[in-house]
Regions:
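Active-site gating loops and adjacent loop-to-helix segments of metal-dependent hydrolytic enzymes
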Residues: 71-102
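Residue-level structural signal for beta-strand termini and adjacent loop
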Residues: 39-42, 61, 73
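Active-site loop-helix segments enriched in His/Asp/Glu that coordinate
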Residues: 95-145
Length: 145
């Protein structure tokens, strides 16, 4: 994976017990793991990034997702429906989803999550096909999420 050094970060959110925000800190990562946080880190990195205009915060965690719904979430026909009517309408669509749609919708959803800082996601797959959860797990592995 290599190494990454982000120098002089404008604001680094620690999420520690005091909720400290560090100004002008550096972060050094190696093989996907944070190895050092501090000022003036002098490490040779494969990639060095100027963080002076950046906010750095820990990865977000999504504890409730339905990735198979990615391609049916904004259908105009169901906007404004009450929950039961919404579910009845969409179950008619979801009963026909196949392995390819689960794979593609999962990857699309994971891409959106990662783009917006989410590093962990718990997916609730409860519809067809029967082995859909295994397909989604494989996409999590492929995406590194």
């Amino acid at each position: 994976m290599g190494s990454l050094l982000i120098k002089n970060i404008h604001s680094l959110v620690t999420c520690n017990g005091e909720d400290r925000i560090l100004r002008g800190a550096d972060v050094y990562c190696e093989d996907g793991f944070i190895r050092a946080i501090g000022r003036g880190i002098d490490s040779k990195a494969d990639i060095t990034v100027d963080g002076s205009h950046m906010l750095c915060y820990p990865g977000l965690v999504n504890t409730h997702h339905h990735l198979y719904q990615q391609f049916s979430r904004n259908l105009p026909e169901v906007q404004g429906f009450e929950l039961f009517d919404w579910l009845r309408y969409l179950y008619d669509i979801w009963k026909n989803i196949d392995e390819e749609l689960i794979t593609l919708s999962s990857l699309t959803g994971m891409g959106e999550l990662m783009k917006n800082g989410c590093t962990t996601c718990f997916d609730h797959h409860y519809v067809f096909p029967r082995d859909g959860g295994d397909l989604i797990a494989a996409q999590f592995e492929a995406a590194g999420l």
